[in-house]
Amino acid sequence: MSTRAPVENADTVSLVCALLVRFPELASIRSGPSERTVRLTFAVRQRLDRAAQAAFAEAIDEHVRSFLALAKEEPAVLRVDCEGDRALTFVHVTRDLETFSKEELELHVAFFTDRCGEALVRNPHPDDHLEADPAAEDEAAQYAVEALRDPTQSKSLVGFREEKRVLVYFLKSQKKAKASARR
């Protein structure tokens, strides 16, 4: 006998899909409700060396802190990590859900677009994507951020784009391993 997931989870999946469609610059988004964090990943079509990664991370940190200072807020979590291979660098920005907003997401997209230009990987819209109303897409993005911030969310999820499709998966919760008995 199987049980159905609550409607809220289906709504969250739909909203995360809307977020990824609205912001094609996002390579992926991952929620961590137990840590109350969200991780945004951007892909850059160039290999950034350690010095460039550090400068990039420092600039993102400065932009976010300045943005939040306008609202007299401080980030509880603000981490920037980079993973690179020969041709790509993935930049992961981890933020606390309490101070994260759609406006901050727009800031990240503008920052990456300005800094990376054509090197920023932008996922194309699906072939069946109709020209949507920008106001409706913005509203859906706002609801998506609010859904991620919802304290009743208990499941982690990851959403990403692959070959003009948006995929969203719920992640299994990781149980802590029991310590072995001492003899």
Regions found by a protein language model. Give the residues of each.
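N-terminal interaction modules that seed assembly of large macromolecular complexes
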Residues: 4-9, 13-68
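Intrinsic-disorder-associated interaction segments
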Residues: 5, 9, 49, 98-101, ...
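Short glycine-rich, low-complexity/disordered patches
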Residues: 28-35, 69-88, 122-141
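Structured domain cores in non-transmembrane regions
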Residues: 47-104
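Ampiphathic alpha-helical segments that act as solvent-exposed interaction surfaces
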Residues: 94-130
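Glycine-rich, aromatic-bearing surface loops/beta-hairpins
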Residues: 120-183
